[in-house]
Design a protein with these regions (language model features):
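N-terminal secretory signal peptides
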Residues: 1-14, 21-26
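C-terminal segment of N-terminal export signals and the immediately downstream linker at the start
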Residues: 9, 30-45
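Conserved C-terminal helix/tail region of periplasmic/extracytoplasmic solute-binding proteins
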Residues: 324-354
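Pocket-lining segment of extracytoplasmic ligand-binding domains
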Residues: 186, 197-288
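Small-molecule pocket liners
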Residues: 131-142, 227-228, 241-250, 323-324
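Short, glycine-/small- and polar/acidic-enriched structural segments
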Residues: 39-184, 190-193, 209-215, 239
Length: 354
């Protein structure tokens, strides 16, 4: 078990109730009456990638209130048993161990998992989650204190840098960007693991010199002032898909219609959140879940100050291939991975452009 710089342990938490640490999911679905002609809904064991809404939208789309008021097939075709992980590497571990059927993975963890063939039967990318590096939208950004002598990436040599988990998307973006400036991430800096919510405090308390901030924590910390940006993920890869939804091939083979229903509700929920008519309630339930003040969320959530998301859940192979190629170019993986061979977007409710 890894322990981060903040002393927190990487642990697995099952959903028990509505709240920050846990989300109403499988135990709070609609009652289902078994009949001779009906089947129980398929339970989907889902592992998150370490973020919460409004970072990972699945964490808010399948909340209890959404199940009862928005989602059409929850409790009928499927239910969700959601495990909150510290990062995408842990989510991949659960897939490999047969303890999760679907998950949010980063491009980095996905490519590594494919090359190592860690998931029995393999897996497919079935929908996008969010993308980084799109002009005019939020980007995962590495910050230092305002009065820090660090002004450019080259100034990070010899510094201590915080990321959420080794092998995560932000970790790979960091390593690629450092190498672009001739800095060896294994020798010239110290990279440490810190849970996303604790990175901002770690920077301010000078336990690290630099750290990555993602939404919603980035917006909260920027509002406090005293920080300055050094670089973001787009500087390493250009526009790219940071995280996406995957399903194991074994689960897809046995429960294809359940995954189709899950994704149909995901897109329905995503569009519900983006609908201006629902904004007040969307902010309320997200605030209740994340414990972020509603007035703070209202400043960026589901606006151009938020991440870029395809509202149909579509993602092109290109925006995943680009950072994966960067990994090979920088020696972080030793073989190419053709992403298009590991995609199945046919279960989404709409048609995606090739």
């Amino acid at each position: 078990m890894k322990i981060g710089i903040d002393g927190s342990k990487i642990s697995r938490r099952r959903i028990l109730k509505y709240g920050l640490a846990v989300v109403g999911g499988a135990t709070l679905g609609f009652p289902f009456i078994r009949t001779a002609h009906a089947q129980s809904p398929v339970k989907i064991r889902y592992a998150t990638g370490g973020g919460i809404g409004p970072n990972e939208m699945e964490t808010v789309i399948y909340l209890d209130w959404m199940q009862k008021n928005v989602l059409k097939q929850y409790g009928k075709a499927y239910t969700v048993d959601m495990t909150f992980t510290r990062g995408t590497p842990e989510a991949a571990t659960l897939l490999a161990a047969g303890q999760a059927d679907m998950a949010t993975l980063s491009f980095a963890v996905f490519a590594t998992s494919i090359l190592k063939d860690v998931v029995p039967g393999g897996m497919k990318i079935v929908a996008d989650n969010y993308q980084d590096g799109h002009k005019g939208y939020a980007a995962n950004t590495f910050f230092v204190l305002q009065d820090s002598p660090v002004k450019t990436v080259s100034d990070l040599r010899g510094k201590r840098i915080g990321i959420n988990a080794y092998g995560s998307a932000v970790d790979l973006a960091l390593r690629v960007r450092l190498k672009m400036d001739g800095i060896d991430p294994r020798k010239d800096v110290q990279i440490v693991e810190i849970a996303f919510p604790n990175i901002g405090p770690a920077i301010r308390e000078k336990r690290i010199d630099c750290g990555v901030l993602i939404l919603p924590f980035m917006n909260n910390e920027v509002q406090k002032g005293g920080l300055k940006a050094v670089f973001n993920g787009g500087d390493a890869f250009g526009p790219y898909s940071v995280i996406f939804h995957v399903a194991t091939n074994n689960f897809l083979k046995a429960n294809r219609e359940a995954v189709r229903a899950f994704l149909s509700d995901y897109v329905l929920g995503l569009k519900w959140f983006y609908d201006p008519a629902n904004r007040k309630r969307a902010i309320e339930i997200t605030s209740e879940f994340t414990k972020s003040p509603a007035n703070v969320l209202d400043q960026y959530f589901m606006t151009e100050r938020d991440y870029y998301r395809d509202r149909d859940g579509c993602v092109s192979a290109e925006v995943i291939q680009r950072p994966v190629d960067g990994m090979q170019r920088e020696g972080l993986i030793d073989k190419p991975v053709k992403i298009a061979d590991y995609m199945d977007l046919s279960l989404l409710p709409g048609l995606c452009k090739a």
